[in-house]
């Protein structure tokens, strides 16, 4: 297993380097000049001041040299300075990362648990009204845009019913501590986490249902039933365990999409995570901050995929890492 993990880390480093190079040039070649944006905000749009800003931040250097200096900085865990906020990019990201991790991990748990539960029930009651209801529900959430789910949730639970706060990470000026603070954050977390969770739940429910129905037709399930095992035991020990492999694969593939969904959700709910930070950096043409967020998000996706491969081994012990 250690050799497998080491190989994946090396491959991940190569992929991460390719992502850095690609995004570096894409961001630099995009329309807009951060020096012009900063000069305009400072109220000094003359060309001399713009030139001084470009020299200060190294934007006047050739792109290959800028890339070399950036990669060299990453090797020492230095993501550079934010052009707009004049703060180390790593500090800005670390300040926002806990909020994003809390949101994405909660949403992932909701989507996976609800998806597997509903998919299992749909497979067990295949062909009945319950199966139809679950399938229709999954299709509705799957076909609805993420931002629309977020807006409808705000209108229903915040505006109409006044049950939940509509934006932010915590109540501004409340100064809660201990359990009260946890409950306050939890109340703010419910809507954004459920928005992402329900969107991805639909995919997991459909995949679980289809996979379980396929496994049910295999010979080893018929053998288990011939031995007199109860339906509950067959479903839990044999069908569900083997049906989870495609779901685990899909969960690994969705890691990048989950972070992408966080960008939209954090923007709608004003959730102070790195998704919203990415959106702000894009509007401000803050190259270093935008690229730093890309690097961190890419690293998170690679780590998540590695964890997915390890979970494979837990779900199916027959998988050999040395293969």
What do the predicted segments below correspond to?
Residues 16-68, 161-182:
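Hydrophobic alpha-helical transmembrane segments of membrane transport/permease proteins
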Residues 2-4, 93-130, 159-162, 173-323:
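Alpha-helical transmembrane segments of integral membrane proteins
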Residues 6-12:
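N-terminal signal-anchor/signal peptide hydrophobic helix marking the start
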Residues 12, 20, 43-44, 112, ...:
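Residue-level recognition of pore/gate-forming positions within transmembrane alpha-helices
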Residues 22-29, 57-58, 70-72, 137-167, ...:
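Membrane-water interface segments at the C-terminal ends of transmembrane alpha-helices
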Residues 59-116:
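An internal, D/E-rich "acidic patch" concept
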Residues 40-58, 135-144, 191-197, 233-250:
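Hydrophobic alpha-helical transmembrane segments
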Residues 9, 49, 53, 63-79, ...:
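Hydrophobic alpha-helical segments of integral membrane proteins
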